[in-house]
């Protein structure tokens, strides 16, 4: 799926976005990654598998920022986690996800936010704050439990 970055995210096609050179966010699976990176002219020389993601990081490469996100599932904090990779270049964001988690976050942004992503920075801010939204509530519950144990 591809969405044009504007105040309201607009669904589009990769062909249209690439032809018009419009800033956009791509939600893809690992299988689609080589094709999309080639089309966006993002050179990524290492072989990276989404199953190899075990922590959150971001690194600056020659023509993009590459990052990984390793996000705990709220109902199973110590168990399995969502694994994402992202690439950000001058015009586009590519989010790689095999689980559907990123699309669920996108749908929440579209439902809850008025200013959904006029810029790459605004979109990434919305994306990250959306999956961290309940973290403070969860931490507060743990804090209360710890205080009760004292």
Residue ranges and their predicted role:
Residues 9-15, 119, 123-127:
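Short amphipathic alpha-helical segments, especially helix-boundary/capping motifs
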Residues 52, 115, 122-150:
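Cytosolic regulatory modules rich in charged/polar residues
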């Amino acid at each position: 799926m591809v969405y044009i970055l504007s105040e309201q995210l607009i669904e589009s096609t990769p062909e249209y976005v690439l032809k018009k050179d419009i800033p956009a966010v791509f939600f893809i699976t690992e299988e689609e990654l080589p094709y999309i990176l080639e089309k966006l002219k993002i050179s990524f020389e290492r072989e990276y598998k989404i199953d190899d993601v075990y922590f959150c990081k971001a690194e600056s490469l020659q023509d993009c920022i590459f990052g990984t996100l390793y996000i705990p599932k709220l109902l199973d904090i110590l168990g399995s986690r969502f694994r994402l990779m992202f690439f950000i270049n001058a015009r586009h964001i590519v989010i790689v996800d095999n689980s559907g988690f990123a699309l669920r976050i996108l749908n929440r942004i579209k439902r809850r936010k008025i200013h959904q992503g006029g810029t790459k920075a605004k979109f990434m801010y919305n994306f990250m704050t959306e999956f961290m939204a309940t973290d403070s509530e969860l931490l507060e519950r743990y804090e209360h439990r710890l205080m009760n144990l004292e």
